[in-house]
Amino acid sequence: FRSMKRIILITTCALMTCASAFAQEDEEPKLVIKPTGRILMDAGVMHSTDETLDNQLNDGVAIPDVRMGVSATYGKWKAKVDVGYARQSLSLKDISLDYNFNKENLIRMGYFVHQFGLQSGTSSSFKISMEEPLANQAFFNSRLIGAMYVHAGEKFHATASVFAENDAMKMTTDKLGNEAWGAMTRLVWRPLTERGKIFHIGISGAYESPRYNKNAAISHKSYTLRAPFPTRIANVAAQEATISDAKALWKFSPEMNFAIGNFGFEAQYFYVGIKRDNAMPNYNAWGAYSNVRYLLKGQGYTYTKADAGIATPDPGSLE
């Protein structure tokens, strides 16, 4: 009887060991590689009552952006490389490496768009309009080298980033000088995230040291705020300002997003303050935009918690 007990015990242990081994094999992460890409086409007829602008805003067609890239996932790791081709030249777009601690928390490192407000959460192919609002163009940053922590919880979304200036991707420091740096954060509260019943409010904040300028006299002593007209056919500034004698830039941006059934609305406000040196008056600027959207065909808007915003409409929808 004792011998039988030992045999049963040994057999049970062996089966448990085998089951554990098979479970480990099942849990072994797999490398998944996916190609990515898109083509952006634009056509337009433009007119301005300002004669100078009218001479610059010419009619035409363009293929201003062709993207090709690859993304790879392996367990808790995800990598992305995206290359753009525009106007007969290649440029690096997103180059990032993510580590997912769990379903709600990750850290991203590399060259990418850091979250600051509604427009920063997704790429241009997922936005309401093909081009971003002018206020966002003027006060937001493009892709930056840095690291970003993201918490995408059930009711609360938060990010925190540190970064170097955009020109760090274009020049070595012997030409660029000491790189400008900064930090930013985005905080969102989302009590309603059901289909056709969405509401969130949030606020973003950022600090930046003075940026590079090709004019050596004001390089890393100034900021340039620029917003082009919303077209890729012509690159014409709607607004532009260079603020010299600068010491630091602070900005904040409250946001709101809601949807009821097939109706959606989003709005964002920007405030920028620049502290200046040499007894120059400090510079302040503000801007805002709002977008209204409606599904002519569809079952109501949905919410994406990873990006904190209204998701791209379902396949087969008409917006």
For each predicted feature, which ranges?
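Short, solvent-exposed loop/turn segments at secondary-structure boundaries
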Residues: 171-175, 278-281
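Surface-exposed beta-loop-beta
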Residues: 180-284
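Extracytoplasmic loops and strand-loop junctions of Gram-negative outer membrane beta-barrel proteins
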Residues: 50-53, 128-133, 234-241, 275
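Flexible, glycine- and charge-enriched loops at secondary-structure boundaries
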Residues: 54, 285
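Outer membrane beta-barrel
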Residues: 26-48, 56-168, 174-211, 289-315, ...
